[in-house]
């Protein structure tokens, strides 16, 4: 299995909306992806509740059967649409991919 985890720190305001509205838009868009991309085995989206200075705002946890399935997901047009939305509203991104 391949696990793909992404963390985002959102801008205070972007695209005419505040941080909370943009987090909701991104979260909803991500949660719609499993119905559109069959290679996704597991997808969870979570908001940070601790709000420490080192914390990111939103996390994505996904699992795939193989590296090839991850690559298919990353190249999928629906994923690209969400990625375009994310790039416009986040200040920082951290990613890790690993096999287990």
Language-model segments: what does each one mean?
Residues 1-56, 65-71, 99-100:
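Short S/T/G/P-rich N-terminal loop/turn motif that feeds into the first structured element of a domain
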């Amino acid at each position: 299995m391949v696990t793909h985890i992404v963390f985002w720190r959102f801008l205070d305001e972007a695209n005419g909306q505040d941080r909370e509205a943009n987090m909701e838009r991104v979260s909803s868009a991500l949660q719609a992806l499993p119905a559109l991309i069959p290679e996704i085995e597991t997808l969870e989206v979570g908001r940070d509740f601790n709000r420490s200075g080192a914390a990111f705002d939103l996390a994505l946890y996904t699992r795939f059967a193989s590296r090839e399935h991850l690559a298919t997901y990353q190249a999928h047009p629906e994923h690209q649409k969400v990625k375009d939305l994310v790039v416009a509203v986040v200040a920082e991104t951290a990613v890790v991919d690993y096999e287990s």
